[in-house]
Structures are given as structure tokens and as C-alpha cells.
Amino acid sequence: SVGDDRQVIIETLSRELRTNDIVIVTGGLGPTKDDIIKAALAHLPGTDTYRTDERQLKIVHDILSSRGLDILDINLAQASVPDTCEVIPNRLGTAPIMVFRFDEEKFGHPATLYSLPGVPFEALGALPDIISDIKSHFPISDIFHKTIMTYGIAESALAKMIEEWEDNLPSDMHLAY
């Protein structure tokens, strides 16, 4: 959890993006002045410019109209997103789901940040889209598990015995013992 301090948010997210390929944050996307995460996210890529996401704008209109609520400028501002993000429409609420992709120049490796609404059912509702996006951008090879039972030999002796074989395994294959 990070407080509502723009600089602390920027520093925390920068630190996390330097050490992780994927960072997922929730909250701070609402229409009120204390919701400052969007401004911090806009700053990360080095730009503070915004655009209106027309799909999210329509969702804002549809949700508020269906509830019989007045559509205020403050509500419409929720469809305003940093220029550098991709938007996954949030069909469950008015706050957009934003995706920021950074090349290795920015944080030393490619990194992706997902910003989800803080309303729990909206964040949970976004997970299928987020997981699909992660799978398409971060292909994961199959995980194969094989259990081999040994007895009568210490772990260190076994490690020494198979050391040369283990050192020659493909780079994406690892042993755990």
C-alpha cells in the first residue's frame, strides 16, 4: 500500500518496474482529487499528456445513464487516459483499465504495468482480460514436474553426482531438490 503522494507513487512504481517484468496496481483511478495514480502513471513514461478513450467514455455514459445519475464533467474525466497507455475497457465501472509497456531502455528490461480500478469486483472482473494480455505478451513454456525418490544418499552427494548433467540442461530447464 502506498499513500496519496504522487512522488512516492512514482518512486515506488519505478523501483518495482526495475525489478519485475509485470506490476499490477489497483485503486486511485476515481473521479475525485485524491485519486492521483493516473497522474503518477502518466509521468512514468516521461509525458504528462492525455487523450479521451472513446470506448471508456461510452461505458461511463452507459453506466451513469442506466443508474439515472447526472453525467458530470468529473465523471467524463475518467475516460481521460495518459497518451502512452493502452486501455482495456472496464465494462463493470467507470475507471479505465490501463496498460503501460516499457522497453528495456527505461527500466533495464521490458516491463509492463497494469492499473486496475480499486473497487474489488471491478478489479476481479478485469483479471480475465489481464491474464489474457499477459499470456499474449509473456509466453510461458510448459512446466513439467517429475518426482524422483532417492534414499540412502545425502542431498549434497546427489548434487555432486549429477552436477555435470545438471549444468548441461537447456537454459529453460531447472531442477529443484
Model-inferred region functions:
Residues 1-7:
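Short beta->alpha junction loops
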Residues 2, 12-15, 19, 25-27:
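Helix-rich terminal scaffold detector
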Residues 7, 95, 156:
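A short acidic, often aromatic-flanked loop/helix-cap motif at beta-alpha or helix-coil junctions
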Residues 7-14, 79, 160:
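Short, contiguous clusters of charged residues that form electrostatic/catalytic patches at enzyme active sites
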Residues 18, 35-138:
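Proline/glycine-rich low-complexity loops and linkers
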Residues 20-23, 48, 172:
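Secondary-structure boundary/capping positions in well-ordered alpha/beta enzyme cores
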Residues 25-33, 117:
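Glycine-rich beta-strand-to-loop/alpha-helix junction loops that act as flexible
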Residues 106, 111-177:
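An accessory alpha-helical subdomain
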